[in-house]
Amino acid sequence: MPRVDEESFGQLLDAMKKAGGVLNDAGIRWALGGGLAAWARGGPETEHDVDLLVKPEDAERAQQALAEAGMRPEKPPEGWLLKAYADNDVLIDLIFDPQGGPVSDETLDRADELEVYAMRMRVVRLEDVLVQKVLALSEQEPDFSSVLELARSLREQVDWDDVRGRTCSSPFAKAYFTLVEALEIVPAATR
């Protein structure tokens, strides 16, 4: 994958810290998700956006808190997230109902507290990140490259049987596991 522009990545991290601080100040539970959650554990840098997981009942309040802090809110047509734009148009996704099921107290409790870019925060487990990404694969979005890169860079840290078990109903997940096993990135299923 091409190298991520350092300035853009720095802007993502700054936006993550600002948004996280705003949500903390508002008393909203959240966890870092997506590509930045993987990066926080040694995965590749991301160039897309900042994914913050919040419970469905907190999503609108979280977006309002970000708006009050100067971020530009947006309500997309998808019914599983809200958005806000930070400085330099960095996109903050407030995800409350990702593939794999809505964000719950259990999801947030499973997240580990880590120091990311000099800020303590909850970071979603890699298994949860991968479940969400693998279940998002579809006929319209069949790109395996990012989930292959995550598997390659973080394979030793992932409970692959957990990810398999939670994604087994998806034909795209079956294709993904066939591929990563054939490439010897991930061990074959232990069942």
Regions flagged by a language model, labelled:
Residues M1-R191:
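Compositionally biased terminal segments of proteins
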